[in-house]
């Protein structure tokens, strides 16, 4: 009986509140119009629901459907199209005299310091505009920084060359030559290392090259440097014989020798003080890297021991930290042929292939998941696309960028990125499955929302 009387009181209260709501809405239409009355009605109903819940016990039927109904109500009423501003704010005031029947109020005069909407940056930029803005901010290196980096790299090369000749006078190292993307106009900010080539002067006729696929390592990227003419020139005739492993010149032994020298024997603080910068070896890296810090810039110098091309059929072979059976082999350096091919393709049609490469390098270097994609991977992507007969103008740069992302995603799906100059080499062969998944997810998301990569 008590429950029945409680429901009766609730019903009578609801009817009384409902009549009040109807009265308010009827008068609100006259004053606020239809739109204002609708908003007032929704707010009134919400207040009514709160009162009902506070004055009555929870009902099972109400709790089941309230949540999604409230969400749908909010979803239906929240996105309203903004109405245009009144004419008084969008048009100048009339200069005629006011009507005598209407009292004139003083019009507030806005101060000259009122913010102007014309100074606000546009909120909607095209993808092409965002891409070019990223290029200007993160890719293009100031010419003064390029000049300073070249000067410091050249000075460090001279100091290191003098050290090698005094420390290892019996080893005929050639002149150390700085180079790399910085010297070829392909430096994406401070992303790429400055290359410092330390050539080994091998005796003609005492050394020959063996393709890596013909060795026990079966590595198509590498070459073995074999000692020959041992019957006429036995071991010990060449100063490089001390680095032989199984009759082959070992890149691993040479790397260990030079790494110990660079990290323990060279007085880098004194050299840095002389050149006006800080220099220290990166002992955590397997490569021979020198960190250079100037008050205006920072960059990394990679010291690369190479077997140059005159005696090796114009191939440039690098002493690189390889693993497994290939640890004593020499990695073929494709950088010279890659840059030459890109330059030739751009010269044919005044294209933007090298600009696309710099954009890809800048984005990948700035993303923790994409940093695994290095210069060689991105260069091969641009070379594969660069051979196609499509537009390579600046206006098509955004389209080519998205095309490069699609190509990378497709390559990651197959876990295969063939080398442009040697299709038997898979540049993704050393990637772990987790790395491929992480990179593929980021690139696929970037295809859906390209601006998220910037």
UniProtKB/Swiss-Prot annotation:
Residues 1-22 are mitochondrial intermembrane. Disulfide bonds: none annotated. Residues 76-113 are annotated as: Disordered. It is found in: Mitochondrion outer membrane. One of its GO terms (cellular component) is mitochondrial outer membrane. The chain crosses the membrane at residues 23-43. Residues 44-454 are cytoplasmic. It holds the Pfam family Mab-21_C. It is a single-pass membrane protein. Signal peptide: none annotated. Its main location: mitochondrion. One of its GO terms (biological process) is regulation of mitochondrion organization. Keywords: Membrane, Mitochondrion, Mitochondrion outer membrane, Transmembrane, Transmembrane helix. PANTHER family: MITOCHONDRIAL DYNAMICS PROTEIN MID49, MITOCHONDRIAL DYNAMICS PROTEINS 49/51 FAMILY MEMBER. Does not bind ADP or other nucleotides, in contrast to MIEF1. Belongs to the MID49/MID51 family. This is Mitochondrial dynamics protein MID49. It comes from Mus musculus (Mouse).
């Amino acid at each position: 009986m008590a429950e029945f009387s409680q429901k009766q009181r609730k019903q009578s209260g609801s009817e009384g509140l409902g009549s009040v709501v109807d009265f308010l809405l009827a008068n609100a239409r006259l004053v606020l119009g239809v739109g204002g009355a609708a908003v007032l009605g929704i707010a009134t109903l919400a207040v009514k629901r709160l009162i009902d819940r506070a004055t009555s016990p929870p009902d099972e039927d109400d709790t089941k459907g309230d949540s999604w109904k409230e969400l749908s109500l909010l979803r239906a009423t929240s996105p309203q199209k903004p109405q245009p501003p009144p004419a008084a704010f969008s048009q100048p005031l009339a200069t005629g005299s006011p009507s005598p029947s209407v009292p004139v109020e003083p019009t507030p005069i806005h101060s000259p310091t009122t913010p102007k909407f014309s100074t606000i940056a546009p909120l909607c930029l095209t993808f092409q505009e965002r891409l070019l803005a990223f290029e200007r901010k993160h890719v293009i290196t100031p010419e003064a920084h390029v000049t300073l980096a070249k000067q410091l790299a050249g000075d460090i090369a001279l100091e290191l060359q003098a050290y090698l000749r005094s420390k290892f006078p019996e080893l005929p190292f050639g002149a150390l030559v700085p180079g790399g993307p910085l010297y070829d106009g392909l430096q994406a900010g401070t992303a790429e290392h400055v290359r410092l080539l330390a050539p080994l002067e091998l005796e003609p006729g005492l050394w020959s090259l063996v393709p890596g696929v013909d060795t026990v390592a079966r590595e198509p990227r590498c070459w073995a440097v074999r000692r020959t003419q041992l019957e006429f020139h036995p071991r010990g005739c060449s100063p490089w014989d001390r680095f032989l492993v199984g009759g082959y010149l070992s890149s691993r032994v040479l790397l260990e020798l030079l790494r110990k020298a660079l990290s323990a024997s060279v007085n880098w603080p004194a050299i840095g003080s002389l050149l006006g910068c800080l220099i220290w070896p990166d002992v955590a890296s397997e490569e021979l890297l020198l960190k250079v810090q100037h008050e205006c810039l920072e960059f990394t110098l990679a010291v690369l021991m190479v077997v140059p091309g005159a005696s090796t059929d114009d191939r440039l072979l690098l002493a690189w930290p390889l693993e497994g059976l290939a640890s004593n082999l020499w990695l073929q350096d494709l950088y010279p042929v890659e840059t030459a091919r890109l330059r030739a393709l751009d010269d044919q049609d005044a294209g933007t292939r090298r600009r696309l490469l710099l954009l890809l390098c800048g984005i990948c270097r700035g993303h923790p998941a994409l940093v695994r994609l290095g210069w060689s991977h991105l260069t091969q992507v641009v070379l594969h696309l660069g051979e196609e007969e499509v537009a390579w103008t600046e206006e098509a740069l955004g389209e080519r960028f998205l095309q490069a992302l699609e190509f990378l995603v497709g390559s990651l799906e197959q876990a295969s990125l063939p080398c442009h100059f040697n299709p038997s080499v898979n540049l993704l062969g050393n990637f772990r499955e987790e790395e491929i998944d992480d990179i593929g997810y980021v690139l696929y998301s970037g295809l859906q929302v390209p601006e998220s990569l910037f």
